[in-house]
Amino acid sequence: MSLQSIKYSRGSLEILDQLLLPGQSKYVVVRGVEDGWKVINKMQVRGAPAIAIVGCLSLAVEINPEDFENKKSLRQEIEGKLNYLVSARPTAVNMKIAADELITLANELYKDEATDVTQMKHRFLDATEAMLKKDIADNRAIGANGAQAILQRVAKAGKTPAGSTGSVRVLTHCNTGSLATAGYGTALGVVRQLAELGKLEHVYCTETRPYNQGARLTAYELVHEKFPATLVLDSMVAALLRAKNVAAVVVGADRVASNGDTANKIGTYQIAVVAKHHDVPFYVAAPLTSIDLAIPGGDHIIIEERPDREMTHVGEHRIAAPGINCWNPAFDVTPASLITGIITERGVFKPAELKEAITKLLES
Protein backbone atom coordinates (compact mmCIF):
# COMPACT_ATOMS: atom_id res chain seq x y z
CA MET A 1 0.00 0.00 0.00
CA SER A 2 1.46 3.37 -1.06
CA LEU A 3 1.97 6.20 1.39
CA GLN A 4 -0.69 8.90 1.72
CA SER A 5 0.79 12.39 1.50
CA ILE A 6 -2.57 14.21 1.24
CA LYS A 7 -5.64 13.59 3.42
CA TYR A 8 -8.70 15.41 2.17
CA SER A 9 -12.43 15.44 2.72
CA ARG A 10 -14.65 18.41 1.95
CA GLY A 11 -13.72 21.18 4.39
CA SER A 12 -10.65 19.36 5.75
CA LEU A 13 -7.08 19.10 4.42
CA GLU A 14 -3.96 17.63 5.99
CA ILE A 15 -0.54 17.04 4.44
CA LEU A 16 2.27 14.76 5.55
CA ASP A 17 5.12 17.05 6.66
CA GLN A 18 7.94 15.89 4.40
CA LEU A 19 10.54 17.96 6.24
CA LEU A 20 10.24 15.54 9.16
CA LEU A 21 10.62 12.33 7.15
CA PRO A 22 11.91 9.70 7.57
CA GLY A 23 12.31 10.24 11.30
CA GLN A 24 8.76 11.33 12.07
CA SER A 25 5.41 10.94 10.30
CA LYS A 26 3.31 13.98 11.20
CA TYR A 27 0.35 15.50 9.39
CA VAL A 28 -0.07 19.28 9.22
CA VAL A 29 -3.54 20.81 9.06
CA VAL A 30 -4.02 23.23 6.15
CA ARG A 31 -6.87 25.60 7.04
CA GLY A 32 -6.73 27.87 4.04
CA VAL A 33 -4.68 29.61 1.38
CA GLU A 34 -2.07 31.13 3.71
CA ASP A 35 -1.36 27.70 5.17
CA GLY A 36 -1.28 26.24 1.66
CA TRP A 37 1.22 28.85 0.45
CA LYS A 38 3.48 28.24 3.45
CA VAL A 39 3.58 24.43 3.25
CA ILE A 40 4.39 24.67 -0.47
CA ASN A 41 7.03 27.38 -0.09
CA LYS A 42 8.70 25.68 2.90
CA MET A 43 8.66 22.36 1.02
CA GLN A 44 6.60 20.58 3.65
CA VAL A 45 4.80 19.37 0.54
CA ARG A 46 6.71 19.12 -2.73
CA GLY A 47 6.56 17.56 -6.14
CA ALA A 48 4.89 19.46 -8.96
CA PRO A 49 1.61 17.46 -9.01
CA ALA A 50 1.24 17.55 -5.22
CA ILE A 51 1.96 21.29 -5.12
CA ALA A 52 -0.91 21.95 -7.53
CA ILE A 53 -3.35 19.70 -5.69
CA VAL A 54 -2.53 21.05 -2.23
CA GLY A 55 -2.66 24.62 -3.50
CA CYS A 56 -6.10 24.19 -5.06
CA LEU A 57 -7.48 22.21 -2.13
CA SER A 58 -6.24 24.85 0.32
CA LEU A 59 -8.51 27.32 -1.45
CA ALA A 60 -11.34 24.78 -1.42
CA VAL A 61 -11.19 24.34 2.37
CA GLU A 62 -11.03 28.12 2.82
CA ILE A 63 -14.12 28.96 0.77
CA ASN A 64 -16.14 25.88 1.80
CA PRO A 65 -17.63 27.41 4.99
CA GLU A 66 -17.95 30.93 3.57
CA ASP A 67 -21.18 32.53 2.41
CA PHE A 68 -20.59 34.87 -0.51
CA GLU A 69 -22.95 37.76 -1.18
CA ASN A 70 -22.72 37.40 -4.93
CA LYS A 71 -20.91 35.59 -7.73
CA LYS A 72 -18.61 38.53 -8.41
CA SER A 73 -17.06 38.40 -4.94
CA LEU A 74 -16.59 34.63 -5.23
CA ARG A 75 -14.97 34.96 -8.65
CA GLN A 76 -12.59 37.64 -7.38
CA GLU A 77 -11.71 35.52 -4.35
CA ILE A 78 -10.91 32.51 -6.53
CA GLU A 79 -8.79 34.42 -9.03
CA GLY A 80 -6.82 36.42 -6.48
CA LYS A 81 -6.07 33.51 -4.17
CA LEU A 82 -5.07 31.12 -6.97
CA ASN A 83 -2.66 33.65 -8.48
CA TYR A 84 -1.14 34.10 -5.02
CA LEU A 85 -0.64 30.34 -4.64
CA VAL A 86 1.23 30.19 -7.96
CA SER A 87 3.91 32.45 -6.46
CA ALA A 88 4.80 29.94 -3.72
CA ARG A 89 7.12 27.96 -6.04
CA PRO A 90 7.10 29.36 -9.59
CA THR A 91 9.19 26.75 -11.46
CA ALA A 92 6.58 23.98 -11.23
CA VAL A 93 4.03 24.65 -13.98
CA ASN A 94 1.28 22.37 -12.62
CA MET A 95 0.03 24.93 -10.11
CA LYS A 96 -0.20 27.61 -12.82
CA ILE A 97 -2.09 25.33 -15.19
CA ALA A 98 -4.48 24.21 -12.45
CA ALA A 99 -5.03 27.83 -11.41
CA ASP A 100 -5.76 28.89 -14.98
CA GLU A 101 -8.26 26.05 -15.43
CA LEU A 102 -10.11 26.90 -12.23
CA ILE A 103 -10.11 30.63 -12.97
CA THR A 104 -11.58 29.88 -16.41
CA LEU A 105 -14.26 27.75 -14.76
CA ALA A 106 -15.04 30.52 -12.26
CA ASN A 107 -15.41 33.04 -15.09
CA GLU A 108 -17.73 30.72 -17.01
CA LEU A 109 -19.91 30.11 -13.95
CA TYR A 110 -19.95 33.84 -13.20
CA LYS A 111 -21.34 34.56 -16.67
CA ASP A 112 -23.90 31.73 -16.54
CA GLU A 113 -27.14 33.38 -15.44
CA ALA A 114 -28.68 29.99 -14.64
CA THR A 115 -26.07 29.37 -11.91
CA ASP A 116 -26.48 31.10 -8.55
CA VAL A 117 -23.65 31.82 -6.10
CA THR A 118 -24.22 28.67 -4.02
CA GLN A 119 -24.21 26.47 -7.10
CA MET A 120 -21.10 28.26 -8.35
CA LYS A 121 -19.26 27.52 -5.11
CA HIS A 122 -20.21 23.85 -5.14
CA ARG A 123 -19.27 23.46 -8.80
CA PHE A 124 -15.87 24.94 -7.98
CA LEU A 125 -15.39 22.58 -5.03
CA ASP A 126 -16.34 19.61 -7.21
CA ALA A 127 -13.75 20.65 -9.80
CA THR A 128 -10.91 20.93 -7.27
CA GLU A 129 -11.77 17.53 -5.79
CA ALA A 130 -11.84 15.99 -9.26
CA MET A 131 -8.21 17.03 -9.70
CA LEU A 132 -7.24 14.82 -6.77
CA LYS A 133 -8.88 11.74 -8.30
CA LYS A 134 -7.57 12.49 -11.79
CA ASP A 135 -3.97 12.75 -10.58
CA ILE A 136 -4.03 9.21 -9.21
CA ALA A 137 -5.55 7.83 -12.42
CA ASP A 138 -3.01 9.74 -14.53
CA ASN A 139 -0.14 8.44 -12.41
CA ARG A 140 -1.23 4.86 -12.95
CA ALA A 141 -1.39 5.43 -16.70
CA ILE A 142 2.08 7.00 -16.65
CA GLY A 143 3.38 4.00 -14.75
CA ALA A 144 1.90 1.54 -17.24
CA ASN A 145 3.13 3.47 -20.29
CA GLY A 146 6.61 3.93 -18.85
CA ALA A 147 7.07 0.32 -17.79
CA GLN A 148 5.99 -0.88 -21.23
CA ALA A 149 8.36 1.52 -23.00
CA ILE A 150 11.33 0.52 -20.85
CA LEU A 151 10.70 -3.22 -21.16
CA GLN A 152 10.24 -3.01 -24.93
CA ARG A 153 13.41 -0.99 -25.40
CA VAL A 154 15.44 -3.21 -23.10
CA ALA A 155 14.20 -6.40 -24.78
CA LYS A 156 15.13 -4.98 -28.17
CA ALA A 157 18.60 -3.97 -26.97
CA GLY A 158 19.17 -7.15 -24.97
CA LYS A 159 20.17 -5.24 -21.82
CA THR A 160 18.40 -7.22 -19.11
CA PRO A 161 20.75 -8.66 -16.48
CA ALA A 162 21.84 -12.26 -17.07
CA GLY A 163 19.46 -14.76 -15.49
CA SER A 164 16.86 -12.12 -14.64
CA THR A 165 13.99 -13.47 -16.82
CA GLY A 166 13.48 -10.05 -18.37
CA SER A 167 13.68 -7.99 -15.19
CA VAL A 168 15.45 -4.63 -15.22
CA ARG A 169 17.52 -2.34 -13.06
CA VAL A 170 16.59 1.34 -13.10
CA LEU A 171 17.89 4.57 -11.61
CA THR A 172 15.73 7.44 -10.39
CA HIS A 173 16.48 10.89 -8.98
CA CYS A 174 14.78 13.05 -6.35
CA ASN A 175 11.31 11.96 -5.20
CA THR A 176 8.49 11.31 -7.63
CA GLY A 177 6.31 8.82 -5.78
CA SER A 178 3.23 8.96 -3.60
CA LEU A 179 4.78 11.76 -1.56
CA ALA A 180 5.14 13.99 -4.64
CA THR A 181 1.68 13.36 -6.08
CA ALA A 182 -1.85 12.54 -4.97
CA GLY A 183 -0.76 8.90 -4.98
CA TYR A 184 1.19 6.21 -6.90
CA GLY A 185 3.75 8.58 -8.46
CA THR A 186 5.17 9.54 -11.85
CA ALA A 187 8.74 8.26 -12.31
CA LEU A 188 8.39 6.17 -9.17
CA GLY A 189 5.03 5.07 -10.54
CA VAL A 190 6.94 3.53 -13.45
CA VAL A 191 9.14 1.71 -10.94
CA ARG A 192 6.05 0.59 -9.04
CA GLN A 193 4.47 -0.75 -12.23
CA LEU A 194 7.65 -2.68 -13.09
CA ALA A 195 7.48 -4.24 -9.63
CA GLU A 196 3.80 -5.12 -10.03
CA LEU A 197 4.66 -6.85 -13.31
CA GLY A 198 7.43 -8.81 -11.60
CA LYS A 199 9.99 -7.09 -13.85
CA LEU A 200 11.92 -4.98 -11.33
CA GLU A 201 15.35 -6.46 -10.70
CA HIS A 202 16.56 -3.46 -8.67
CA VAL A 203 16.02 0.28 -8.29
CA TYR A 204 18.76 2.75 -7.42
CA CYS A 205 17.91 6.16 -6.01
CA THR A 206 20.19 9.16 -5.62
CA GLU A 207 20.47 11.04 -2.33
CA THR A 208 19.53 14.29 -4.16
CA ARG A 209 21.50 16.94 -2.36
CA PRO A 210 21.11 19.44 -0.84
CA TYR A 211 17.57 18.69 0.37
CA ASN A 212 18.11 14.93 0.27
CA GLN A 213 14.71 14.09 -1.17
CA GLY A 214 16.11 10.82 -2.47
CA ALA A 215 17.69 9.73 0.80
CA ARG A 216 14.84 10.98 3.01
CA LEU A 217 11.77 10.41 0.86
CA THR A 218 12.37 8.05 -2.06
CA ALA A 219 14.35 5.62 0.09
CA TYR A 220 11.53 5.84 2.65
CA GLU A 221 8.96 4.91 0.01
CA LEU A 222 11.09 2.10 -1.43
CA VAL A 223 11.61 0.54 1.99
CA HIS A 224 7.89 0.93 2.73
CA GLU A 225 7.06 -0.88 -0.52
CA LYS A 226 9.75 -3.54 0.11
CA PHE A 227 11.28 -2.99 -3.33
CA PRO A 228 14.85 -4.22 -3.93
CA ALA A 229 16.58 -0.86 -3.66
CA THR A 230 19.93 0.81 -3.09
CA LEU A 231 20.73 4.42 -2.22
CA VAL A 232 23.69 6.02 -4.02
CA LEU A 233 25.39 9.38 -3.68
CA ASP A 234 24.79 11.94 -6.43
CA SER A 235 28.48 11.73 -7.33
CA MET A 236 28.29 7.95 -7.91
CA VAL A 237 26.00 7.93 -10.94
CA ALA A 238 28.72 7.55 -13.57
CA ALA A 239 30.30 4.67 -11.68
CA LEU A 240 26.88 3.08 -11.16
CA LEU A 241 25.93 3.15 -14.84
CA ARG A 242 29.30 1.71 -15.78
CA ALA A 243 29.25 -1.12 -13.23
CA LYS A 244 25.66 -2.22 -12.60
CA ASN A 245 24.05 -2.76 -16.01
CA VAL A 246 21.30 -0.21 -15.37
CA ALA A 247 18.67 -0.56 -18.09
CA ALA A 248 17.11 2.91 -17.87
CA VAL A 249 17.00 6.18 -15.99
CA VAL A 250 13.55 7.56 -15.22
CA VAL A 251 13.00 10.95 -13.58
CA GLY A 252 10.11 13.34 -13.04
CA ALA A 253 9.64 16.91 -14.22
CA ASP A 254 8.57 20.23 -12.80
CA ARG A 255 8.15 21.82 -16.22
CA VAL A 256 8.62 20.55 -19.77
CA ALA A 257 9.00 23.11 -22.56
CA SER A 258 7.31 22.58 -25.92
CA ASN A 259 10.61 21.41 -27.48
CA GLY A 260 11.10 18.78 -24.76
CA ASP A 261 13.67 20.63 -22.64
CA THR A 262 12.89 19.60 -19.07
CA ALA A 263 13.30 21.40 -15.76
CA ASN A 264 13.68 18.97 -12.89
CA LYS A 265 15.50 18.70 -9.58
CA ILE A 266 19.08 19.95 -9.64
CA GLY A 267 21.38 17.14 -10.70
CA THR A 268 19.07 15.76 -13.38
CA TYR A 269 21.05 17.36 -16.20
CA GLN A 270 24.33 15.74 -15.20
CA ILE A 271 22.63 12.34 -14.87
CA ALA A 272 21.30 12.74 -18.42
CA VAL A 273 24.79 13.56 -19.71
CA VAL A 274 26.24 10.49 -18.00
CA ALA A 275 23.38 8.30 -19.26
CA LYS A 276 24.03 9.47 -22.83
CA HIS A 277 27.72 8.60 -22.49
CA HIS A 278 26.89 5.09 -21.29
CA ASP A 279 24.10 4.57 -23.84
CA VAL A 280 21.45 4.22 -21.12
CA PRO A 281 17.98 5.46 -22.15
CA PHE A 282 16.86 8.51 -20.18
CA TYR A 283 13.11 8.96 -19.64
CA VAL A 284 11.10 11.82 -18.19
CA ALA A 285 7.79 10.83 -16.56
CA ALA A 286 5.30 13.67 -16.26
CA PRO A 287 1.56 14.33 -16.58
CA LEU A 288 0.33 16.58 -19.37
CA THR A 289 -0.12 19.30 -16.74
CA SER A 290 3.68 19.50 -16.44
CA ILE A 291 4.07 20.30 -20.15
CA ASP A 292 4.07 24.01 -20.93
CA LEU A 293 3.47 24.50 -24.64
CA ALA A 294 3.68 28.27 -24.17
CA ILE A 295 7.42 28.02 -23.49
CA PRO A 296 9.50 27.26 -26.62
CA GLY A 297 12.60 26.03 -24.80
CA GLY A 298 14.34 25.55 -21.49
CA ASP A 299 16.00 28.97 -21.55
CA HIS A 300 12.59 30.49 -20.82
CA ILE A 301 11.98 28.48 -17.64
CA ILE A 302 12.37 30.42 -14.39
CA ILE A 303 14.71 28.56 -12.04
CA GLU A 304 13.98 28.95 -8.34
CA GLU A 305 17.00 29.60 -6.11
CA ARG A 306 16.91 28.38 -2.54
CA PRO A 307 18.55 29.67 0.68
CA ASP A 308 22.27 29.07 1.33
CA ARG A 309 21.44 27.32 4.57
CA GLU A 310 20.12 24.28 2.72
CA MET A 311 23.69 23.70 1.52
CA THR A 312 25.65 24.81 4.56
CA HIS A 313 23.70 23.02 7.30
CA VAL A 314 22.28 19.60 8.10
CA GLY A 315 19.59 20.32 10.64
CA GLU A 316 21.19 22.74 13.08
CA HIS A 317 24.72 21.50 12.36
CA ARG A 318 26.89 23.55 10.02
CA ILE A 319 28.91 21.44 7.56
CA ALA A 320 30.40 24.18 5.34
CA ALA A 321 33.10 26.70 6.22
CA PRO A 322 31.64 29.99 7.54
CA GLY A 323 31.96 32.78 4.99
CA ILE A 324 31.84 30.59 1.87
CA ASN A 325 29.54 31.77 -0.92
CA CYS A 326 26.81 29.40 -2.13
CA TRP A 327 24.84 28.94 -5.35
CA ASN A 328 21.72 26.87 -4.75
CA PRO A 329 19.39 26.54 -7.75
CA ALA A 330 16.60 24.10 -6.98
CA PHE A 331 16.35 22.89 -10.58
CA ASP A 332 18.33 22.51 -13.77
CA VAL A 333 17.22 22.08 -17.38
CA THR A 334 17.99 18.91 -19.30
CA PRO A 335 18.18 19.53 -23.06
CA ALA A 336 15.75 17.57 -25.18
CA SER A 337 18.66 16.05 -27.09
CA LEU A 338 19.54 13.97 -24.00
CA ILE A 339 16.00 12.66 -23.44
CA THR A 340 14.93 9.32 -24.94
CA GLY A 341 11.23 9.77 -24.31
CA ILE A 342 8.69 11.74 -22.30
CA ILE A 343 6.23 9.44 -20.55
CA THR A 344 2.72 10.86 -20.08
CA GLU A 345 -0.67 9.44 -19.21
CA ARG A 346 -1.52 9.54 -22.93
CA GLY A 347 1.60 7.82 -24.26
CA VAL A 348 5.37 8.10 -24.61
CA PHE A 349 6.67 10.78 -26.96
CA LYS A 350 10.05 11.67 -28.38
CA PRO A 351 10.91 15.30 -27.56
CA ALA A 352 10.87 16.27 -31.25
CA GLU A 353 7.26 15.11 -31.64
CA LEU A 354 6.02 16.38 -28.27
CA LYS A 355 4.47 19.71 -29.27
CA GLU A 356 2.52 18.35 -32.23
CA ALA A 357 1.35 15.27 -30.32
CA ILE A 358 0.21 17.17 -27.24
CA THR A 359 -1.51 19.84 -29.32
CA LYS A 360 -3.54 17.13 -31.10
CA LEU A 361 -4.42 15.47 -27.79
CA LEU A 362 -5.60 18.75 -26.29
CA GLU A 363 -7.67 19.57 -29.39
CA SER A 364 -9.39 16.18 -29.26
From Swiss-Prot:
One of its GO terms (biological process) is L-methionine salvage from methylthioadenosine. Pathway: Amino-acid biosynthesis; L-methionine biosynthesis via salvage pathway; L-methionine from S-methyl-5-thio-alpha-D-ribose 1-phosphate: step 1/6. The keyword Cytoplasm applies. It catalyses: 5-(methylsulfanyl)-alpha-D-ribose 1-phosphate = 5-(methylsulfanyl)-D-ribulose 1-phosphate. InterPro entries: IF-2B-related, IF-M1Pi, IF_2B-like_C, Initiation_fac_2B_a/b/d, M1Pi_N, NagB/RpiA_transferase-like. Transmembrane segments: none annotated. The record marks C174 as: Transition state stabilizer. It comes from the Eukaryota. GO terms for molecular function: S-methyl-5-thioribose-1-phosphate isomerase activity. Its EC number is 5.3.1.23. Keywords: Amino-acid biosynthesis, Cytoplasm, Isomerase, Methionine biosynthesis, Nucleus. The active site is at D254. It is found in: Cytoplasm; Nucleus. One of its GO terms (cellular component) is cytoplasm. PANTHER family: METHYLTHIORIBOSE-1-PHOSPHATE ISOMERASE. Belongs to the eIF-2B alpha/beta/delta subunits family. MtnA subfamily. Catalyzes the interconversion of methylthioribose-1-phosphate (MTR-1-P) into methylthioribulose-1-phosphate (MTRu-1-P). NCBIfam families: eIF-2B_rel (TIGR00524), PRK05720.1 (NF004326), salvage_mtnA (TIGR00512). This is Methylthioribose-1-phosphate isomerase.
